[in-house]
Structure formats: C-alpha cells, structure tokens
Curated annotation (Swiss-Prot):
Lineage summary: Bacteria, Pseudomonadati, Pseudomonadota, Gammaproteobacteria, Pasteurellales
Stated family: Belongs to the HscB family.
Name of the protein in question: Co-chaperone protein HscB homolog
Organism: Mannheimia succiniciproducens (strain KCTC 0769BP / MBEL55E)
MF terms (GO), sorted A to Z: ATPase activator activity; protein-folding chaperone binding
Domain J as annotated: residue spans: 3-75
InterPro entries hit by this protein: DnaJ_domain, HscB, HscB_C_sf, HscB_oligo_C, J_dom_sf
Keywords: Chaperone
HAMAP family to which the protein is assigned, alphabetical: HscB
Gene Ontology terms describing biological process: [2Fe-2S] cluster assembly; protein complex oligomerization; protein folding
SMART domains the UniProt entry points to: DnaJ
Assembly with partners or alone: Interacts with HscA and stimulates its ATPase activity.
Length: 173
C-alpha cells in the first residue's frame, strides 16, 4: 500500500491539520501540473500524470475518516480491510442497526419529515461519537477496536446516505 501520509509529508495520525493537507495538495498539484512537463518526454509526462493521480487518490483517503482509519490500520498491521466482510460478532451493534433501519423505514412510510430531522440528528451525533472513539483507539494503537469502530462508521455512513435519499424524496412531495 502506498502511504498517503508520506506523500503529503504528514504524520500518520487520525487527526489531521486540514489546512496543511490543503497546502500540501496544492503544492504537489502545482509541481505536477502538465504545463511543467510540456517540453518533457512522453515518459516524463506519463509519470507526472500518474503521480498526479496518486496525489488525488491519497487526498481522497486522507479526507475521508473511514478510509484514513483503514490506511492507518493497514500501515501499522499490514492487514488490508476487507470491506465486504461483515461483522456479525458485534451483536449489540447489529441490534442497533436493525432498530435504526426499522425506525428509518417507519419514517419513510409515514413521510414524517420532523421525525426524519430528529433521526438524522441522532445519527449525526452517533457518527461524531464514533469518530472520537476511533481517534482514541488509533492513538492507543488498539487496532482491533479501531477496526470494529470503523465497521460501525461504515454502517453509519450508509445510513446517512439513506437518510439523505429519503429527505430528498420527502422534499419532493
């Protein structure tokens, strides 16, 4: 795995200085801009384009807390996260998922916009809590706990996308 932190000359930490990340991104993109390679060989132009794509990919990883956590875990353990792998050992969270899904389905069926706003705020709060928890787990190098929390964050992210879909649907009525 390429190390996006190294590419951006950033410490391998979950909490990132977003301003520094943006500054490094702009500097890298400026250095790799095609105009800088207009008089270069085709191979140098291709390498610059590949490096630019790497920079863009690395930025996406570093900006997304779930991908950033996956990256930190992989860099420290050598294990890649299998996002298709389902975590069924976390029965309490599995029950929570079912409850949230049922609640969201009920909100959609009854077209309860106020209920959706309340539910959305609850999920946003849960997301913030999990972000804080994963930050702690990663700083303590508790990779198993970090993986577990990141799985929860993945579910919450999907749920937030579903909330947005329902919000758009209800707004159209």
């Amino acid at each position: 795995m390429n190390n996006p932190f190294a590419l951006f000359d950033l410490p391998i930490e979950f909490q990132l200085d977003q301003n520094r990340l943006s500054e490094r991104y702009l500097a890298l993109q400026k250095a790799l801009h095609p105009d800088n390679f207009a008089n270069s060989s085709a191979q140098e132009q291709r390498l610059a384009m590949q490096k630019s794509a790497e920079v863009n990919d690395a930025l996406q990883i570093l900006k997304d807390p779930i991908l950033r956590a996956d990256c930190i875990i992989a860099l420290n353990t050598g294990e890649q996260q299998n996002t298709e792998e389902k975590s069924t050992q976390d029965m309490a969270f599995l029950m929570q998922q079912m409850q949230w899904r049922e609640q969201l389905e009920e909100i959609e069926n009854t077209q309860d916009i106020d209920g959706l706003m309340t539910f959305s705020a609850e999920i946003e709060q849960s997301n913030k809590e999990k972000i804080s928890e994963i930050s702690t787990a990663l700083s303590m190098k508790d990779w198993q706990q970090a993986k577990l929390i990141n799985d929860r964050l993945r579910f919450i992210k999907k749920l937030m996308t579903e909330i947005e879909r329902i919000e758009d649907k209800l707004a159209d009525f």
